[in-house]
Amino acid sequence: MAKNRFNQHWLHDHINDPYVKMAQREGYRARAAYKLKEIDEQDKLIRPGQVIVDLGATPGSWSQYARNKLAQGKKRDTQREGGIDGTIIALDLLPMEPIADVHFIQGDFREDDVLRQLEDVLEGRAVDLVISDMAPNLSGVASADAARIEHLCDLALEFAQNHLKPDGALLVKCFHGSGYSQIVEKFKQQFKVVAPRKPKASRDKSSETFILGRQLKQPR
């Protein structure tokens, strides 16, 4: 019974959520697009000509937002009509419906085959921005969940270290609670500038937050 009440409350909140309504109206696949939008507007992350990698991209709202932003900056005299000024590569273990001008690779980005596909698209270029909305399946056991969250952040940090330009940026989702300070410390070890971000589109009751790192301390 309690679970049913929880589901009813969640459904009511979801249906009446202004960001859900806005996403439906503007064609985004999830309200998460507005989290990236707010952070981007504050920190000017996405700019014309960039190479962007979206980790854990499915269902695709972050890639949609990045695609729309790069389409706005398109140089019409040099880019084909309908294209974008830049490159977006989305990766996920799960399938994702196609998005115009977005390269999607399904698989684990730690595996050689997936990395080869990524390198084929990059064509030797370094990455300007890595964005990660990855989140684990939470168990409700604080210590186990903290370890899973930290593991995903570690994967994003390692990917960024291997692929980012020296002045590139990494934005990841994490959660306040056990293990959060350790994640922040890892960011500080890797980046010159580190800042937490809590966009308004994150639900008030959620411990969800984002960490932004800029400028690698030891670029490869």
Curated annotation (Swiss-Prot):
Similarity field: Belongs to the class I-like SAM-binding methyltransferase superfamily. RNA methyltransferase RlmE family.
Query: Which GO CC annotations does the UniProt entry carry?
Result: cytoplasm
Q: What is its main location?
A: cytoplasm
The entry's S-adenosyl-L-methionine-binding residues are: 60, 62, 92, 108, 133
Q: Matching PANTHER family, A to Z?
A: RIBOSOMAL RNA METHYLTRANSFERASE, RRNA METHYLTRANSFERASE 2, MITOCHONDRIAL
Enzymatic reactions: uridine(2552) in 23S rRNA + S-adenosyl-L-methionine = 2'-O-methyluridine(2552) in 23S rRNA + S-adenosyl-L-homocysteine + H(+)
- Which HAMAP family does this UniProt record tie to the protein? RNA_methyltr_E
Gene3D superfamilies tied to this protein: Vaccinia Virus protein VP39
Q: What does this protein do?
A: Specifically methylates the uridine in position 2552 of 23S rRNA at the 2'-O position of the ribose in the fully assembled 50S ribosomal subunit.
Molecular function terms from GO = rRNA (uridine-2'-O-)-methyltransferase activity
Which residues lie within the region annotated Disordered? Answer: 197-220
Enumerate the subcellular locations listed in this protein's record, separating them with semicolons. Answer: Cytoplasm
Disulphide bonds annotated for this chain are none
The protein depicted here goes by the name Ribosomal RNA large subunit methyltransferase E
Keywords, alphabetical: Cytoplasm, Methyltransferase, rRNA processing, S-adenosyl-L-methionine, Transferase
Catalytic positions are 173
For this protein, the Enzyme Commission number is 2.1.1.166
Instruction: Name the InterPro entries on file.
Output: RNA_methyltr_RlmE, RNA_MeTrfase_FtsJ_dom, rRNA-MeTfrase_E, SAM-dependent_MTases_sf
Q: What organism is the protein native to?
A: Burkholderia ambifaria (strain MC40-6)
Gene (name only): rlmE
Kindly give the Pfam families that the UniProt entry links to this protein: FtsJ
